[in-house]
Amino acid sequence: MVTASDDGTPPVRHFFTVDVEEYFQVNAFEHAIPRSEWASWPSRLEHAITTLLELMDRHRTVGTFFVLGWVADRLPEVVRQIARAGHEVASHGFWHRRAFTMSPVEFREDVRSSKALLEDIVGQPVIGFRAPSFSIIPGLEWTFDILLEEGFRYDSSLFPVHRREYGYPRAARDPHEIGRAHV
């Protein structure tokens, strides 16, 4: 999205991104609502995504939707609706597991299964990834190697601040390419 000012200054680029996950999948609820019970909770995504897509269309805004594989598996038509509206569909992992809770093998399987499912649904390559809760932190640089090996071209997981459970304080604040085992 590009916005211009009335005073003649150059336009500013904005990135509009959405994490597509159910309300009961956020980390704050992980001890109250285990994954084994997710399917028993009512979905609120269909209405929310439809409303958001209508609003974005009205304002001629295009964005990237980081879709959880679990959601895509249960609501493939919602994922198709996002793609048909001209938005990018990217991966948010499959199970909403934070990267720092997984081994490299588990991380690879999670991103691989999510990417394959999303590509099957939308019929086009999925090149973007965002870890749940911005959970790629210092010490997890191996995640970038795996993302590159699995065919991702960019990552949107780094939050350049320090917080208790997320943040990568020395991360670049501008868009940049990911490389092998470095940020």
Regions found by a protein language model. Give the residues of each.
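Active-site flanking residues adjacent to catalytic metal/cofactor-binding acidic residues
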Residues: V18, S91, Y154-S156
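Histidine-centered catalytic micro-motifs
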Residues: V89-H96
